[in-house]
């Protein structure tokens, strides 16, 4: 039987890893030879979840076309966020909760996207639809993804469906969602040992916005000041990254998981897009964004609309 690879976006977060594992597990239960793989390194938060529920991290793959002819995408659809050789394979399925952009196929594809806060919320439904019981360790990872994407149910992306799914998954996993969730978020928020390269790559995603090429990374922390102490080093490396990738704008969104506010470090020839989008003026390349915690719902849409107006 031909193998199918299941993977999420580059610079994987907890939802990407958990969704790949959970969906590959479901496909195997349904008789498909599926393997969850990853396109980048696992972050501290995700590793905490993997260790807690005793699940091995997926295998790292740099060229998916050397491994399989057919792939399934989870937690993303935009080609620039996917495998470098994504055009050399056939995408057969997509399970996602983001905007649909820069995505097309030559053949019909099973595409399931829902306006919920996390991909594993959708997968929880799919397990039920197929009558497959979720293993406790898989449920734990799926819960971890919801906690991560919703910042423990505080993000504006969080829906009632996410909360209900989290409660169900916590029961299966045998944990208290709030107690476990806070421990996991704190583990991921320790940025003290991160290198500059690791910081600017944290959950980094590339977007096409109007005529512009934009990259947005997000770092969750309990102390934004600690990160900003390294601003000079960050800016030097970001400027090099902008030149290397020919970016019009780079944003590092540093989010305080305790106050639910963010500080955005913005650089690039189109950095003023962020100022116009939020109606704020940057000071020393920094913008203070009160109440902003979600890149998907509070940053990408307003930036996309502002960029579109430039055309």
Curated annotation (Swiss-Prot):
Gene3D superfamilies: DHHA2 domain, inorganic pyrophosphatase (n-terminal core). Mn(2+) 2 binds at residues 15, 75, 97, 149. It is found in: Cytoplasm. SMART domains: DHHA2. Pfam families: DHH (PF01368), DHHA2 (PF02833). Keywords: Cytoplasm, Hydrolase, Manganese, Metal-binding. InterPro entries: DDH_dom, DHH_sf, DHHA2, DHHA2_dom_sf, Mn-dep_inorganic_PyrPase, Oligoribo/pAp-PDE_c-di-AMP_PDE. Binds 2 manganese ions per subunit. One of its GO terms (molecular function) is inorganic diphosphate phosphatase activity. It comes from the Bacteria. It catalyses: diphosphate + H2O = 2 phosphate + H(+). Belongs to the PPase class C family. This is Probable manganese-dependent inorganic pyrophosphatase. The lineage of its organism: Bacteria, Bacillati, Bacillota, Bacilli, Bacillales. The gene is ppaC.
